[in-house]
């Protein structure tokens, strides 16, 4: 047997560039019979290594490289598992090292785990004799071929391997530079570390003692460990009075079924079936464990989602409180979740509110023990973009070049360097000079290697034994992790549950809590009506900002066209709006509005597809069709569905024949059977799990219900979740204003870090103010809670410590209106800053001394700042306007002129704006033009004025005025902009509109009687303007008569209407 006993794979992170598949490929090509994986301190690569070896008839040997110490000296040591007990010892030894961040292993620690291991000390010198002597009674202790001779110790040839060929030695230097954040030495030739995979020819050229090579075979023969997959490692649930889990589960289920007062016989029949499947597969403990942790969450103020994935199709899950979706009511299939004909672990993923998810994990750790619960490792890899920058950095590329590299590699998921090389600009960069070609060569060698570890976002492993008995552990940022990935840990047989954090659940929970506290209303989301017409009106208008699953522009558009009328419409939309099924949306909407257009290939499809108007949307429908036509069990139907989605031609052909034969035996003609099979094959690729759609649609409905009935609380919490994003905050503020919600400035006595809903509106968060950080807000709020509300500005200044009370902070708070409630103008308070800063005697904590020793502080009253300046400061400090901006205020007053906002204006429509910025530039031809920033009081937009227009309006732009602009909308650098063709002052535009209007449209006739004498039945001369009435209730326009524009009462007539009720066209 030829064996390599010291392979370091790429999972020896940033120490080896040898991928497992390359090591095995080289072993096959060199007729190597056995390989030992010996990464330093870790066992990350064991499962992949084992699978690759077995697939290629290579004997896998499990080992690890460690550094053993006696406190004075350290010796590199390779330990190999002789058997499965030794493998478990490796798990525990690696876990001890990683959990305790050990760089070296004491000889005592190694001795604890050495009974079932082979120990090979490397490069042993005289200074290491004491360490080796400790293991003199250990029969399987060796020294490598480079060690000194010690009586009684055998030597073995052992070659360290961490890259493929001599030409790959540069990868080790590059990885070391990346790891240590140093530069790569490109001047001198790269050192050959002598750690490449030796060929048989190279080994024969070495002068190796034959006895040393013989010992290689001896050791390889002794090692006989293997990974065991699909073990039964489910933890046992502790039941009351040591009752069996099966009996206890049944007792709990029947008790709950009776309590819910459902149609007992129907539900009992389904329950018996599910219970039998679950217990026959041995999963009763699993369901009790999941039920227990969800019960803990619900009874400890942690909101849990209604369900996730296919688990909502289980009645057992519903009765145990794991889900809140009744599978019989919603026609959900248990077999989509758990299939007796496809034995796999059940997979229940759980959504918790993201801010309290850790509470549940902590509960599980406390219940089962710290070493019994862990997260799961994931690996970050040196993918194309990452490796390109990393290698560029260590080669000394400047920031400009690194940015150029980033710009040349497309932002495409999974892109490779080979794909990037097909792009001409990238190829030119590579061949620009020899240095770039060297860079590309190193990048290619390192591409795809694992770079670092991180924590899987949701997966938690639970066992009633210490986990290191089954898998090695390491330490993550927040607790223990398995050293193996999610799929690897599950394949071993370990129980994995996904604890997912869902932001929307946190929002719902916070709204419910605030409504109960402020309004005394206890909303039970399980009892809200799911046929609320106000909710469906909201959805039909596409007013879904902030609504889970429904807030994208595309979904809004679908909702407006569909006009949902019941909950099933929401379920359908969330399922259809994805790549693939989107093409069926027009068909679904058309048939939904006109069911007479629904056609079925066969009448027996109608009961299955009636609720979706003949369109196959859900995976469960595919299973139902297979069951109805081909007499498949639901288990067989689920296997068919999976086969269809995988597109395996051989399997598909087999399943096609199976389906057609089944349908023929069931009395269906072969032609219709083939058509039905092709129909479900078309949809199998993107059919959506209905159980998941129903669960997530329930969250969407709940959020819609809260938005309709408690809008202040809804928007306050949505806003609190976008703190830090100026753009999203501004969008949400504008949306709330459109809904008629009053946005109140930050209030020093009401506001805190999050937005605060109230009966009057929403108080802005102090945290949104630029320059005011979280710690400052915490100090202010804590002081207010402990010692009561602030009496005035001076009281605030006295009670807040110096380290927080800076001029910058005080100015920011004043200018956004945080002290407005004290009744002093912002300009007055700005004037008072010097008093509180200059007169500060650092005796804030003693109010009595303050009053005695400090001169009485007095306000010097000043007139309020101009509206425009207030708006300017609010925009500067908040990113949006709280007070009504002068432009917006003028827009409200002048909207009768038929003017537009930037957000809803179309090409060449008049828009009321002010110019925030005018940047004049000179073109290559020496002509002047300008880039401008337009402000309509709500939002800003970039604009451009080309030379011809600029020459025409240059003098006008020098005035600080309000303007009406029009032009064509365009995109520049993927940003919307306006190419301005015409500019007028508002006064000029109004004058022309009044003089030359073609039509007057009114929406309110209450003022008409006062001007009855002005209105003529027919047009008598050119100055007569048609007067029309638009009835919004019936969406109809009628002509009332004509009014003469030259009439002395014309302006009075116009001004007598509310600006929102009249338009001049």
Curated annotation (Swiss-Prot):
Catalytic activity: DNA(n) + a 2'-deoxyribonucleoside 5'-triphosphate = DNA(n+1) + diphosphate
Keywords: Cytoplasm, DNA replication, DNA-directed DNA polymerase, Nucleotidyltransferase, Transferase
EC number of the protein: 2.7.7.7
GO terms of biological process kind: DNA replication
Predominant subcellular localization, coarse grouping: cytoplasm
EC class (word): transferase
SMART domains: POLIIIAc
Gene Ontology cellular component list: cytoplasm
Compartments, as annotated in UniProt: Cytoplasm
GO-annotated molecular function: 3'-5' exonuclease activity; DNA-directed DNA polymerase activity; nucleic acid binding
Task of the protein: DNA polymerase III is a complex, multichain enzyme responsible for most of the replicative synthesis in bacteria. This DNA polymerase also exhibits 3' to 5' exonuclease activity. The alpha chain is the DNA polymerase.
Family: Belongs to the DNA polymerase type-C family. DnaE subfamily.
Subunit structure: DNA polymerase III contains a core (composed of alpha, epsilon and theta chains) that associates with a tau subunit. This core dimerizes to form the PolIII' complex. PolIII' associates with the gamma complex (composed of gamma, delta, delta', psi and chi chains) and with the beta chain to form the complete DNA polymerase III complex.
Entry protein name: DNA polymerase III subunit alpha
């Amino acid at each position: 047997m030829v064996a390599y006993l010291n392979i370091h794979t790429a999972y020896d992170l940033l120490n080896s560039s040898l991928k497992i598949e390359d090591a095995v490929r080289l072993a096959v090509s060199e007729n190597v019979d056995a390989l030992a994986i010996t990464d330093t301190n870790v066992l990350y690569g064991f499962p992949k290594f084992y699978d690759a070896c077995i697939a290629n008839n290579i004997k896998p040997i499990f080992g690890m490289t460690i550094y053993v110490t006696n406190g004075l000296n350290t010796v590199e040591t390779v330990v190999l598992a002789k058997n499965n007990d030794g493998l478990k010892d490796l798990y525990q030894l690696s876990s001890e090292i990683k959990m305790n961040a050990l760089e070296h292993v004491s000889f005592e620690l190694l001795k604890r785990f050495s009974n079932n291991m082979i120990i090979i000390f490397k490069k042993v010198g005289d200074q290491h004799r004491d360490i080796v002597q400790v293991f003199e009674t250990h029969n399987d202790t060796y020294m490598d071929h480079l060690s000194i001779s010690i009586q009684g110790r055998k030597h073995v040839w052992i070659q360290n391997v961490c890259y493929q060929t001599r030409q790959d030695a540069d990868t080790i230097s590059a990885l070391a530079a990346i790891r240590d954040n140093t530069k790569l030495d490109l001047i001198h030739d790269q050192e050959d570390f002598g750690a490449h995979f030796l060929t048989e020819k190279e080994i024969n050229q070495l002068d190796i003692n034959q006895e040393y090579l013989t010992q290689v075979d001896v050791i390889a023969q002794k090692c006989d460990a293997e990974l065991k997959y699909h073990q039964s490692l489910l933890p046992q649930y502790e039941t009351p009075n040591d009752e069996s889990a099966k009996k206890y589960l049944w007792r709990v289920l029947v008790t709950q079924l009776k309590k819910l007062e459902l149609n007992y016989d129907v539900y009992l029949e389904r329950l018996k079936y599910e219970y039998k499947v679950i217990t026959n597969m041995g999963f009763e403990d699993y369901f009790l464990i999941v039920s227990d942790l969800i019960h803990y969450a619900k009874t400890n103020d942690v909101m849990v989602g209604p369900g996730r994935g296919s688990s909502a199709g289980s009645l057992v899950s519903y009765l145990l409180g794991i889900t809140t979706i009744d599978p019989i009511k919603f026609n959900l299939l248990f077999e989509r979740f758990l299939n007796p004909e496809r034995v796999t672990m059940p997979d229940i993923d759980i959504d918790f509110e993201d801010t309290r998810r850790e509470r549940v994990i902590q509960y599980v750790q406390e219940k089962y023990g710290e070493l019994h619960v862990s997260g799961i490792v994931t690996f970050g890899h040196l993918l194309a973009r990452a490796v390109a920058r990393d290698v560029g950095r260590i080669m000394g590329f400047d920031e400009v070049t690194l940015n150029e590299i980033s710009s040349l590699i497309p932002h495409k998921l999974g892109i490779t360097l080979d794909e990037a090389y097909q792009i001409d600009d990238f190829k030119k960069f590579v061949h620009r000079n020899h240095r770039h070609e060297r860079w590309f060569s190193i990048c290619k060698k390192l591409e795809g290697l694992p770079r670092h570890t991180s924590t899987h976002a949701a997966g938690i492993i639970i066992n009633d034994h210490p986990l290191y008995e089954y898998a090695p552990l390491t330490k993550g940022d927040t607790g223990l992790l398995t050293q193996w990935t999610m799929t690897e840990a599950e394949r071993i047989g370990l129980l994995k549950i996904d604890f997912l954090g869902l932001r929307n659940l946190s929002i719902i929970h916070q709204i419910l809590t605030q409504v109960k506290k402020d309004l005394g209303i206890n909303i039970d989301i399980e009892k809200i009506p799911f046929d609320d017409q106000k909710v469906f009106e909201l959805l039909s208008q596409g007013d879904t900002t902030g609504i889970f699953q429904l807030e994208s522009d595309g979904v809004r558009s679908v909702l407006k066209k569909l006009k949902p009328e019941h909950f099933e419409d929401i379920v359908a939309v969330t399922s259809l709006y994805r790549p693939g099924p989107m093409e069926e949306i027009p068909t679904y909407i058309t048939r939904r509005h006109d069911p007479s257009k629904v056609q079925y290939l066969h009448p027996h499809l109608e009961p299955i597809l009636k609720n979706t108007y003949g369109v196959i949307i859900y995976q469960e429908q595919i299973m139902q069709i297979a069951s109805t036509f081909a007499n498949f069990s639901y288990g067989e139907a689920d296997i068919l569905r999976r086969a269809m989605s995988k597109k395996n031609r051989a399997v598909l052909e087999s399943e096609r024949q199976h389906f057609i034969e089944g349908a023929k035996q069931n009395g269906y003609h072969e032609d219709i059977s083939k058509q039905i099979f092709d129909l479900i094959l078309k949809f199998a690729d993107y059919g959506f799990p209905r159980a998941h759609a129903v669960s997530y649609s329930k969250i969407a409905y709940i959020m819609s219900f809260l938005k309709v009935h408690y809008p202040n609380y809804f928007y306050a919490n949505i806003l609190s979740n976008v703190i830090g994003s100026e753009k999203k905050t501004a969008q949400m503020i504008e949306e709330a204003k459109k809904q008629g919600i009053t946005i109140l400035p930050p209030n020093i006595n009401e506001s805190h870090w999050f937005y605060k809903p109230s009966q009057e509106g929403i108080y802005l968060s102090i945290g949104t103010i630029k320059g005011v950080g979280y710690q400052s807000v915490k100090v202010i709020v804590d002081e207010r809670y402990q010692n009561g509300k602030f009496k005035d500005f001076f009281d605030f200044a006295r009670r807040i410590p110096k380290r927080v009370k800076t001029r910058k902070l005080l100015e920011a708070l004043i200018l956004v209106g945080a002290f407005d409630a004290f009744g002093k103008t912002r300009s007055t308070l700005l004037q008072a800053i010097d008093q509180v800063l200059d007169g500060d005697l650092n005796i804030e904590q003693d109010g009595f001394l303050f009053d005695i020793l400090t001169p009485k502080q007095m306000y010097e009253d000043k007139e309020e700042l101009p509206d425009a300046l207030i708006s300017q400061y609010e925009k500067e400090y908040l990113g949006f306007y709280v007070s009504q901006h002068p432009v917006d205020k003028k827009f409200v007053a002048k909207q009768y002129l038929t003017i537009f906002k930037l957000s809803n204006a179309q090409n060449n429509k008049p828009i009321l704006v002010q110019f925030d910025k005018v940047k004049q530039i000179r073109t290559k031809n020496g002509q002047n033009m300008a880039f401008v920033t337009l402000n309509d009081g709500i939002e800003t937009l970039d604009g451009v004025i080309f030379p011809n227009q600029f020459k025409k309006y240059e003098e006008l732009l020098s005035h600080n005025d309000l303007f009406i602009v029009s032009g064509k909308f365009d995109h520049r650098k993927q940003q919307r902009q306006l190419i301005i063709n015409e500019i007028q002052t508002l006064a000029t535009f109004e004058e022309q509109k009044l003089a030359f209007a073609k039509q007057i449209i009114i929406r309110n006739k209450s003022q008409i009687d006062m001007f009855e004498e002005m209105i003529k039945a027919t047009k008598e001369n050119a100055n007569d303007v048609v007067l029309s009435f638009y009835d919004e209730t019936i969406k109809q326009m009628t002509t009332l008569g004509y009014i003469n524009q030259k009439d002395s009462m014309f302006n009075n007539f116009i001004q007598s209407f509310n600006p929102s009720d009249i338009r001049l066209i």
